[in-house]
């Protein structure tokens, strides 16, 4: 809980600044920063290593990202380092993306199906989810053969499970209680 609250606070502060400056640009840079940290072990080592001094970390990060990140994002990273909050970077980026989506009236729908959906099925599902939520929908599709058939949709905390696997599970439960 503490990690989420800390990430929320920092993400909210950066978001408010980004709305004033350049929301799309700052969001893209933050994602670029996260991707670099996740994919480059040396960058992650410098950023997270407890025995590298704060000033060394800031100097190295500023050198690495000098031409890549705006002053705003570099200053934000320096703030995280100064406050020893760099371990929250990935969670902050996740919360920031959610805040940016909310500001743009976008909702993410995770759609899992046993086989890939046809283009027609995707379009119908997209339209129905947009109608249900009243928002623009970004679908993240996943194929999971263990679902047997049907579709499972997750939007935020809400899950709609119309899979064959779920229906079979409910039948098993009702038979075992009978």
Swiss-Prot record:
It is a peripheral membrane protein. GO terms for cellular component: plasma membrane; proton-transporting ATP synthase complex. InterPro entries: ATP_synth_OSCP/delta_N_sf, ATPase_OSCP/dsu. One of its GO terms (molecular function) is proton-transporting ATP synthase activity, rotational mechanism. It is found in: Cell membrane. Pfam families: OSCP. Gene3D superfamilies: N-terminal domain of the delta subunit of the F1F0-ATP synthase (1.10.520.20). Keywords: ATP synthesis, Cell membrane, CF(1), Hydrogen ion transport, Ion transport, Membrane, Transport. F(1)F(0) ATP synthase produces ATP from ADP in the presence of a proton or sodium gradient. F-type ATPases consist of two structural domains, F(1) containing the extramembraneous catalytic core and F(0) containing the membrane proton channel, linked together by a central stalk and a peripheral stalk. During catalysis, ATP synthesis in the catalytic domain of F(1) is coupled via a rotary mechanism of the central stalk subunits to proton translocation. Belongs to the ATPase delta chain family. F-type ATPases have 2 components, F(1) - the catalytic core - and F(0) - the membrane proton channel. F(1) has five subunits: alpha(3), beta(3), gamma(1), delta(1), epsilon(1). F(0) has three main subunits: a(1), b(2) and c(10-14). The alpha and beta chains form an alternating ring which encloses part of the gamma chain. F(1) is attached to F(0) by a central stalk formed by the gamma and epsilon chains, while a peripheral stalk is formed by the delta and b chains. NCBIfam families: ATP_synt_delta (TIGR01145), PRK05758.2-2 (NF004402), PRK05758.2-4 (NF004403). This is ATP synthase subunit delta. It comes from Desulfitobacterium hafniense (strain DSM 10664 / DCB-2).
């Amino acid at each position: 809980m503490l990690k989420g609250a800390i990430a929320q606070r920092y993400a909210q502060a950066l978001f408010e600044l980004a709305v004033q400056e350049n929301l799309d640009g700052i969001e893209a840079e933050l994602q670029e920063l996260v991707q670099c940290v996740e994919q480059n072990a040396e960058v992650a080592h410098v950023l997270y290593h407890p025995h590298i001094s704060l000033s060394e970390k800031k100097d190295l990060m500023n050198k690495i990202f000098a031409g890549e990140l705006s002053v705003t994002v570099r200053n934000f990273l320096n703030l995280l380092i100064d406050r020893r909050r760099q371990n929250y970077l990935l969670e902050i980026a996740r919360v920031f993306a959610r805040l940016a989506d909310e500001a743009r009236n976008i909702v993410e729908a995770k759609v899992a199906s046993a086989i890939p959906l046809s283009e027609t099925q995707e379009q119908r599902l997209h339209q129905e989810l947009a109608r249900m939520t009243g928002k623009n929908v970004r679908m993240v599709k996943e194929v999971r053969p263990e679902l047997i058939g049907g579709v499972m949709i997750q939007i935020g905390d809400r899950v709609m499970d119309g899979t064959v696997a779920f229906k079979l599970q409910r039948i098993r439960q009702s038979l075992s209680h009978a």
